Amino acid sequence: MRMTKRVLIAGFTGAMGQKAVNLVNSLSDFKIVAGLSPSAENDPQKYNLPEDAQIFNSLDEIPDNLTDIWIDFTLPKAVYNNVKFALTHHISPIVGTTGLSDGQEAELIEISKEEKVGGIIAPNFGISAVLLMKFAKEAAKYFPDVEIIEMHHADKKDAPSGTALATAKMIAENRPAHQTAPDEVETLENVRGGDYEGIKIHSVRLPGYVAHEQVLFGGTGEALTIRQDSFDRQSFMSGVKVALEKVDQLNELVVGLENIL
């Protein structure tokens, strides 16, 4: 018989956190034992948590040996310290919060190796987004001229999105650094977007959107567009479920859901 895995959800009061709460509550092999949120009241049932779940407002309140898995849907300013705390306390993190720098990711991976703790950081838990990144990486072999447009809800704190940046990194692996229009002149500052190794990234923040991305490739006399749309945050939960089921098989922190599919 499988042992029930204990889960702490950081950011459980937010939209993604509540989706994660509902997911874990529906799984017989996992149980929410705690939640972390700086402003949450000590009323588990208000947030759909089990009646005996503990609620913490800061990291220093969390006791040792409380949980096996740490799900993080918090904020860019909190995620690094949260994941570092989890790893150093031998808790396997499943991280959907974006905003970590390359240096922070590298440092957390080193900590995970030292502590021998597996975990996953996923720029996007949606299967369609993972496939978009995979297809874009393959297309980059044939179309070196490419730009990315990502569109998200108005409350998203970081730009570009973690998914767009991850897409750019994967594309860059399959093509040399390449500037499509090296002599262009901007008459309006930053009108051409951010630049990652010659890949322009454009970020849109508007009400009515959830999470969407287009990768536009241009060639001589032809073009290719790959688009992904997440219309409901529930779409991300299929990836979180996979991560919950497979995180025990990891020996270190990995970046990207595609590495465990």
From Swiss-Prot:
InterPro entries: DapB_C (IPR022663), DapB_N (IPR000846), DapB_N_CS (IPR022664), DHDPR_bac (IPR023940), NAD(P)-bd_dom_sf (IPR036291). The active site is at residues 152, 156. One of its GO terms (biological process) is lysine biosynthetic process via diaminopimelate. It catalyses: (S)-2,3,4,5-tetrahydrodipicolinate + NAD(+) + H2O = (2S,4S)-4-hydroxy-2,3,4,5-tetrahydrodipicolinate + NADH + H(+); (S)-2,3,4,5-tetrahydrodipicolinate + NADP(+) + H2O = (2S,4S)-4-hydroxy-2,3,4,5-tetrahydrodipicolinate + NADPH + H(+). The lineage of its organism: Bacteria, Bacillati, Bacillota, Bacilli, Lactobacillales. Catalyzes the conversion of 4-hydroxy-tetrahydrodipicolinate (HTPA) to tetrahydrodipicolinate. This is 4-hydroxy-tetrahydrodipicolinate reductase. SUPFAM superfamilies: Glyceraldehyde-3-phosphate dehydrogenase-like, C-terminal domain, NAD(P)-binding Rossmann-fold domains. The gene is dapB. Pathway: Amino-acid biosynthesis; L-lysine biosynthesis via DAP pathway; (S)-tetrahydrodipicolinate from L-aspartate: step 4/4. Its EC number is 1.17.1.8. GO terms for molecular function: 4-hydroxy-tetrahydrodipicolinate reductase; NAD binding; NADP binding; oxidoreductase activity, acting on CH or CH2 groups, NAD or NADP as acceptor. GO terms for cellular component: cytosol. (S)-2,3,4,5-tetrahydrodipicolinate binds at residues 153, 162-163. It is found in: Cytoplasm.
